[in-house]
């Protein structure tokens, strides 16, 4: 690979700083530091001069050296001084002559020997001739070869800037419609939000890059291409430090290199330059979303389905496990860590992702415990404030130990956050604000504030005698009038609610929608059970009346679509027990089976009687001995 003198990625750091034995005796105060890494796929050498630019380094490829002196590239010149003589992670039999590849010094070509340490297996080797030490890279490190870095850097940045045009909202809506039944308003909001997120990524290019493009007209580079080049340099610099085992922000060497890279990047206008500027660029800001609705209405399913069709990283995080910093539980930074993991630890790609915060209503504060520290409620909301608005989060690096403190900085300014929660009892709070009675079952004016009081009131008013359809319609009507003060009374702090400007209420599922959920969408409930029975060569037939009866049972349980699977498991328990290894070829379920008036019907295949098969299976039916005696006589 050619020298990197034309880029701004800085110098590459190596895993082991080596020098000659004479230089080691004089100390490292000389005018030159020599660093070498011996890898399975190649050898990377970097020379850093005291007063030379840090970015001036060279790279020498290396190949395997076989026993007969012929290199893997087929040159076969056998020159010991050639840097293309091989290296591998394992030396095989070494000097014993039993075959296998041998480690050779990339400087002089002489054989290297393992350094004896107190550890049984060492990765360090030494050249006896030129007294150089090398470290043998592992399989994981060899996969991150320096030779492949420019290609991976270009791919990582072009994913964000040179992708195909973002899908229109209608196309995203149609895709969600294949898997999620109903919730048309929520689908439209999510589709538009994702589309605008794509546009914000593609258009929020710093203004200084446009000015730089005007200055560098001879390069004929567009602002987007300049941004790609800059991010390629940053990406390559970060990956070189990771391969060398050095954090970009963890020591003096990495810090100095990062400072040099930052100095070469044009900064935004500040101070007097802003006052004198006559042109202001429009920067698109994000609009975080809050989905609220009853349990089983499809909030999490919408997020899971949306994650499949996106070209940006998408992470789903459960807020119930989050705690304030310093307490047992998952830290708030783990939200961004999951997004970084989904982006394959590409920081630039993760900074343009989408985070789905599930069960966000569970971190609501609980009134009445002010003498205690609410580490799982209000404390988590306070920790999420800057995360939602946009800040730099320190996330632990990949394969880094906690004690070492190596972190990666991720900017959350362009990360879109979508929160969701059931908010049980929120309709009671809205009803109290509107001074309305709730279906004639008393007034909640004497109830306390907070999510616990609201949930208790909602549970107390659940009665089997109430009209289920009327109850659902009333709740949906109230949720459509939700305001920020209702969420604050529920237990969310005002600062948290203000950072979620788009509030989307999801409606409850009625009987017709539940019947559609059973059969229509891809990966529906009934086709899943039909696939289970087909593995035992059996069919499952469910009548239309049975589907409606199942939907009515789910409505009475008030658990939404999740109640459908519970009902189906109870109905099909006996058939799933009887069908395997039997002659049943069809199971029929009708309305009476759902209502518990009779058992499921079975259709059996015609049997072929054979005395030999009965004898082999050990089955003795009544009258079988007499038939056998008659046959023998």
Swiss-Prot record:
InterPro entries named in the record: AAA+_ATPase, ATP-dep_Clp_protease_ClpX, ATPase_AAA_core, Clp_ATPase_C, Clp_protease_ATP-bd_su_ClpX, P-loop_NTPase, Znf_CppX_C4
GO molecular function terms attached to this record: ATP binding; ATP hydrolysis activity; ATP-dependent protein folding chaperone; protein dimerization activity; unfolded protein binding; zinc ion binding
Record has Membrane as a keyword: no
Residues annotated as binding Zn(2+): 105, 108, 127, 130
Transit peptide, start-end: 1-56
Signal peptide, first to last residue: none
A GO cellular component entry from the record: mitochondrial matrix
Residue stretches of biased makeup (Basic and acidic residues): 69-83, 598-610
N6-acetyllysine PTM positions: 437
Transmembrane segments: none
Acidic residues: bias regions: 611-622
EC number: 3.6.4.10
EC category: hydrolase
Domain (ClpX-type ZB) ranges: 93-146
Positions of post-translational Phosphoserine modification: 617
Catalyzed reaction equations: ATP + H2O = ADP + phosphate + H(+)
Region annotated Disordered, chain positions: 68-100, 598-633
Record-stated family: Belongs to the ClpX chaperone family.
Subunit description: Homohexamer that forms a ring structure; this hexamerization requires ATP binding. Component of the ClpXP complex formed by the assembly of two CLPP heptameric rings with two CLPX hexameric rings, giving rise to a symmetrical structure with two central CLPP rings flanked by a CLPX ring at either end of the complex. Interacts with TFAM.
Protein's name according to its UniProt entry: ATP-dependent clpX-like chaperone, mitochondrial
Organism of derivation: Pongo abelii (Sumatran orangutan)
